[in-house]
Amino acid sequence: MLSIMLAIVFVLFVLIYLIISIKNHHPFLHRIETLIQDFNNTLLFGAYVQIYDLSTPARTERLFIIAPENVVLYNFNKTLYYYLDSANVFCPNEFSVTTFTQSTIKTINETGIYATACTPVSSLTLIEHFATLKNNVPDHTLVLDVVDQQIQFSILDIINYLIYNGYVDLLAE
């Protein structure tokens, strides 16, 4: 009877040892940890915003390129245009933009409905125009880091950040 009990204890000890050793020395453990580490590192980057400014004293004209999402915002004469990716859905043969002005922001806050418009001017055309005139060098580059809690990392948060800090001009004179 004692030998059976010792055999059971020995088998349990061996099983526990195997479970612990497999957990600590899993053949894919290093690859799994590397994948998780890489994923966590990509979440810590945040975003950066390239600002091209062609403003004059009479009017505001700025282009914002938000990376890594490649979102294009265009601020012209107290209106911010946000180029949407779903251009062909809303506007056949044209490009869809959401417009932000003081009045449309109030409407968005009250109803949750965004004002969209169609335009024949593509975001690529705007980028080429500004990059050519500025020799492909932005006037400012903002680095918004998630670690410092500057943004919560959604496009609307970045738009709010740009408006709040005065990069986007929506105020009527």
Curated annotation (Swiss-Prot):
Function: Per os factor that plays an essential role in the initiation of host midgut infection. May form a specific complex with PIF1, PIF2 and P74 to bind host receptors.
InterPro entries: AcMNPV_PIF-4 (IPR006883)
Residue ranges the record marks as coiled coil: none
Residues in the signal sequence: 1-21
Protein name as catalogued: Per os infectivity factor 4
Subcellular location: Virion membrane; Host cytoplasm; Host nucleus
Pfam families: Baculo_19
Membrane recorded as keyword: yes
GO cellular component: host cell cytoplasm; host cell nucleus; membrane; virion membrane
Organism: Autographa californica nuclear polyhedrosis virus
Gene: AC96
Family the UniProt entry places it in: Belongs to the baculoviridae 19 kDa protein family.
Chief location category: virion
Alphabetical UniProt keywords: Host cytoplasm, Host nucleus, Membrane, Signal, Virion
